[in-house]
């Protein structure tokens, strides 16, 4: 099973709590995180894009770096780890994204890929006059389908004459082209999102579910497999989890309860309000899960809380779910968390035995 790190491009990472570590996003912080991840043989690093935060006492995600420029910088200071940036497709023409991706492919030596998002949070785009109207909620994957067709044309042949409802290319050209086939990932959890990933993506991200229920996402992975069967493609799931680990289960649980006790209710209320804006996409979207009150303090990503041994065991359970190709990890404290993962958790994981072998050979 592949392991990735979801780098904190926004302030405070993924904990919406006054009791969580409070920090601003910087290049130096993210460089330290990704270089540590590479040292411990993580397979990939991904950054999201966020253009407007949730506010509240913690000013959650009110402070964000930009994904492509951040990952270009990180590509230049790493050598092995795969690097993924996220394109907010309402803000960037596909021909520009194709050229930026080709540039970072050159910087990274073929280690770069692109995560495509349609955009669900209206205020991110409305503030710039770029929101296309609420009908977009129902048509966003039609838009994204044309978008990725233009990308594939330009990366594959260097030119595009695509004509669609949303994009018109007139002998559009991009050169140089990427040195490797460009990986495209998506985070579709709705039926429409999974159908898109099945047709166009190489991997699909999904949320883990619950606290210490590592296989609860299995129905989502099964839906992705079923969607991919219809297109005859192999599109595996990468699952998002937060790791909160300590020497004992009790110590880790105490940290988790402390974070929950400091939940930033004002920021969470704003998230809930935004999640109700999309009435077109059904009840199975990512944002619906993010705003669920069960564990909104970390936007309801799957959460693994326990001793190092317990977390290793739960991650092995994740790996056992059919259709799972990898996990995307966040941490309550990224620098300490990645060290703990590399030194205390990963060596205990059966699904990462190949990493232990590599480490022994290097030593």
From Swiss-Prot:
Top-tier EC class: oxidoreductase
Single GO biological process annotation from the record: uracil catabolic process
Gene3D superfamilies (UniProt xref): Luciferase-like domain
Pfam families tied to this protein: Bac_luciferase
GO molecular function annotations of the record: alkanesulfonate monooxygenase activity; uracil oxygenase activity
Keyword match NADP: yes
Tagged with keyword Disulfide bond: no
InterPro entries assigned to the protein according to its UniProt record, in alphabetical order: Luciferase-like_dom, Luciferase-like_sf, Pyrimidine_monooxygenase_RutA, SsuD_RutA_monooxygenase
Record function comment: The FMN-N(5)-oxide reacts spontaneously with NADH to produce FMN. Requires the flavin reductase RutF to regenerate FMN in vivo.
Species the sequence originates in: Klebsiella pneumoniae subsp. pneumoniae (strain ATCC 700721 / MGH 78578)
Keywords: Flavoprotein, FMN, Monooxygenase, NADP, Oxidoreductase
UniProt family annotation: Belongs to the NtaA/SnaA/DszA monooxygenase family. RutA subfamily.
Annotated EC: 1.14.99.46
The reaction(s) this protein catalyses: uracil + FMNH2 + NADH + O2 = (Z)-3-ureidoacrylate + FMN + NAD(+) + H2O + H(+); thymine + FMNH2 + NADH + O2 = (Z)-2-methylureidoacrylate + FMN + NAD(+) + H2O + H(+)
Domain of life: Bacteria
Binding positions for FMN per the UniProt entry: 49-50, 115, 124, 140-141, 190
Protein name: Pyrimidine monooxygenase RutA
């Amino acid at each position: 099973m592949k392991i990735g790190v979801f780098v904190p491009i926004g302030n405070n990472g993924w904990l919406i709590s006054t009791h969580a570590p409070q920090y601003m996003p910087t290049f130096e912080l993210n460089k330290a995180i990704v270089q540590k991840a590479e040292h411990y043989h993580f397979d990939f690093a991904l950054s999201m894009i966020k253009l407007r935060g949730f506010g509240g006492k913690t000013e959650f995600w009110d402070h964000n770096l930009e994904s492509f420029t951040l990952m270009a910088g990180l590509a230049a200071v790493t050598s092995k780890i795969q690097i993924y940036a996220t394109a907010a497709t309402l803000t960037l023409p596909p021909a520009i994204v194709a050229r930026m991706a080709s540039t970072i492919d050159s910087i990274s030596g073929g280690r770069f890929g692109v995560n495509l998002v349609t955009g669900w949070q209206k205020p991110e785009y409305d503030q710039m006059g770029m929101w296309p109207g609420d009908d977009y909620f129902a048509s966003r994957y039609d838009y994204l389908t044309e978008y990725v067709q233009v990308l594939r044309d330009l990366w594959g042949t260097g030119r595009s004459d695509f004509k669609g409802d949303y994009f018109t290319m007139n002998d559009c050209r991009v050169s140089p082209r990427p040195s490797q086939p460009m990986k495209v990932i998506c985070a579709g959890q709705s039926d429409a999102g999974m159908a898109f990933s099945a047709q166009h993506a190489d991997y699909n991200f999904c949320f883990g579910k619950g606290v210490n229920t590592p296989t609860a996402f299995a129905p989502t992975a099964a839906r992705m497999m079923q969607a991919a069967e219809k297109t005859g493609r192999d599109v595996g799931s990468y699952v998002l989890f937060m790791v909160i680990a300590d020497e004992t289960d009790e110590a880790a649980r105490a940290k988790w309860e402390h974070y929950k006790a400091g939940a930033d209710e004002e920021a969470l209320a704003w998230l809930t309000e935004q999640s109700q804006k999309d009435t077109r996409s059904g009840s199975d979207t990512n944002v619906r899960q993010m705003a669920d009150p069960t564990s909104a303090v970390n936007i309801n990503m799957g959460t693994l809380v326990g001793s190092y041994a317990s977390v290793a065991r739960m991650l092995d359970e994740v790996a056992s779910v059919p259709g799972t190709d990898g996990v995307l990890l966040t941490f309550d404290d990224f620098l300490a968390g990645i060290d703990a993962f590399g030194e205390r958790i990963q060596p205990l994981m059966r699904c990462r035995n190949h990493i232990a072998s590599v480490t022994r050979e290097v030593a």
